[in-house]
């Protein structure tokens, strides 16, 4: 049966929403599996890797996707809970035709999402997603079903964890170890809860873990990169050298220095860029950040003579610009850091290991490395919105933004944008004085709230 209205389910990071509420319902997951299978049938007999995080609802969508794919003649390879970058790696390692991750990343347990990779582990282009949306809207899959002897089969990959662990460890030099480091590791009760502790323990670190007891309902709950205060406290309590906080699917990381201070994606990106620049490993002396990158990061790169490309917010756009501008390092403030020499997506474990390597090779504390970036005061307010009209169409908003930009001049920035995965408007203001930044951000947020908002968080 053809759907009666325009059908848009993909956002900037695949499909995402409240579990058991459209679009995150099993019927759409089944149809998505069939649509993906129909596209892949053009390649002949195909195989798809399917991974997930630890949300209770993952079982629902995993089974629906497998049913949809197999019904279209596609073989599926299940890896169970595994970080998103691990699924991208396994997709390449098995020479599969695509990979699927069931995860809502840093969101609470009651949300879920589905994102797809191509055979190289890159997220699918917008054109593929649009074609699948059109197929799902028409819902004419019965006409394309294969004969009964061509139905796909489902197989469990039992060594996916071990393969990914060895892949991650291979990005760390054999000549050094983590023997003298005490590390706090917060896995957010998410996809990294099994593999992440083993990576650091096998490299001989002393590891204090938290967020490693998922129950389906506690992913990202007061733990992980969205709640670094848990790792900060553990660093203090255990007198650790460093803290590592992953998000729910372990594609992003926030680090904590020995003084329990947060080291975010911008600073980690700068640390790694400087190291790669010195070793002549930074391709074209270029790094990709985003429009949200802190001005302190931009100025630190300028001092090095490193060009900064500013992409849209979202790791898929960072990666697109890395490919477009021939860069091998990119990332965003939230903790997605992409090393294209190692993987095709953000990888929290790989990023953390690169920073630890630099600490060891330079005999530096993380706080010393982080001091390279003199961060500008910055705030970001999130306003829940009832709709997403063009921001340019809201005259009062345009006026207040212009006023704030005039006040800041060349010493600050304003960025107002909609989230690609939530019904949220984000207001970012950056400038030389923290109190002024907060005041100006609130002025803009108040107008957003009055015009289209529900509540400010």
UniProtKB/Swiss-Prot annotation:
Gene3D superfamilies: Alpha-D-Glucose-1,6-Bisphosphate, subunit A, domain 3, Alpha-D-phosphohexomutase, C-terminal domain. GO terms for biological process: carbohydrate metabolic process; peptidoglycan biosynthetic process; UDP-N-acetylglucosamine biosynthetic process. Its cofactor is Mg(2+). GO terms for cellular component: cytosol. This is Phosphoglucosamine mutase. The active site is at residue 105. The modification Phosphoserine is found at residue 105. Catalyzes the conversion of glucosamine-6-phosphate to glucosamine-1-phosphate. Belongs to the phosphohexose mutase family. SUPFAM superfamilies: Phosphoglucomutase, C-terminal domain, Phosphoglucomutase, first 3 domains. InterPro entries: A-D-PHexomutase_a/b/a-I, A-D-PHexomutase_a/b/a-I/II/III, A-D-PHexomutase_a/b/a-II, A-D-PHexomutase_a/b/a-III, A-D-PHexomutase_C, A-D-PHexomutase_C_sf, A-D-PHexomutase_CS, Alpha-D-phosphohexomutase_SF. GO terms for molecular function: magnesium ion binding; phosphoglucosamine mutase activity; phosphomannomutase activity. It comes from the Bacteria.
